[in-house]
């Protein structure tokens, strides 16, 4: 008996996973026992950006040398640039072969040159075993066959893929061919270049991520509308430039949502602020569609502003327990009262940025230095010069809140921030915990920051936690 045959099946299988398809085919003649174990290949990967990878043609020949009974679990293909005159034909021959071998996960990262055209083989859309399919990037899908069916597919990822079916909606055909789809990730999309029905529809979908590729300074964006018909969706991460409207929004099962809208140039949230030729998108239906969420993250200040200008559409969030809002130091908090008044069961409020101040007061309130009582001796500020912005008025909207936890993600300990915290601690009668995240400083400043905050009056049950975050490396 040779030494390899004396190893356990698990060890041999692990060794096999590191071999190329061609080498494995040669090695499979070592013994009958090896051949039996090699009926399943855990991973098959090709990446022509790596040294000594060889050509796709060689890789294909190695695959064809495997016994027809060999099954392959995971396949990953990364192709950049040109790889021989028959690169597209070789790639499709390779895909047609592996898709007959019971593949569970297929990842394609294919760059298509601008002067070339490439079409995926029909077999990609009719594979009965695929559980996860990832398509990218700079890939164009012109046609999804009428007989498309991916009966086992649960996860679909499309990255920088463009759909442009002239005879119908290839994107919706693809979704309709996935009867048990659970998760859809749409990354680096550019709707404005798609030819589609502007509809995301799936009765089984539970997790959805949509991420628009945004170019800074982009002025051309004229999407008519996007419809969400996803009644089983529980998790939504939506990063986009807002279309003109959201005709239909069916998100009745939604539990958690992260919304990040970026308003392009020549767009305005309200006609009052629009200039001639500006587009005024309506997010009313999108806001109403979020009514059942338990966790809501408004992760851009443009999104927070959209809620303010559409405040009449804000529903009562009966199930909302955790709310996160993005802030900037000079960004007005006028949306916050509307959100808190419509969230009767809110328990956790996360301020995703610095605390807001009345920047129009100027000197003394822009300072990033930690407040010290000695500063008062050098100031002659009148009590009438309240640095709190009018958007928060007297903070009376906090008095009816049941919030138990407040998190501040960027706390500097300045005088204005202490005034903010004083209002939070006084008005939030149910407050039990304040979490403060601040950048690392020297020990003396740490002590000063802690002391200032801990000395503020509060309920006896309210505790304060501090976490000092190290600065990001510039490397």
Curated annotation (Swiss-Prot):
User: Which organism is this entry from?
Assistant: Arabidopsis thaliana (Mouse-ear cress)
Under the heading InterPro entries, the entry gives: F-box-like_dom_sf, F-box_dom, FBD, FBL60-like, LRR_dom_sf, LRR_FXL15/At3g58940/PEG3-like
Superkingdom is Eukaryota
SMART domains attached to this UniProt entry: FBD
Name-wise, this protein is Putative F-box protein At3g58960
Segments forming domain F-box: 1-49
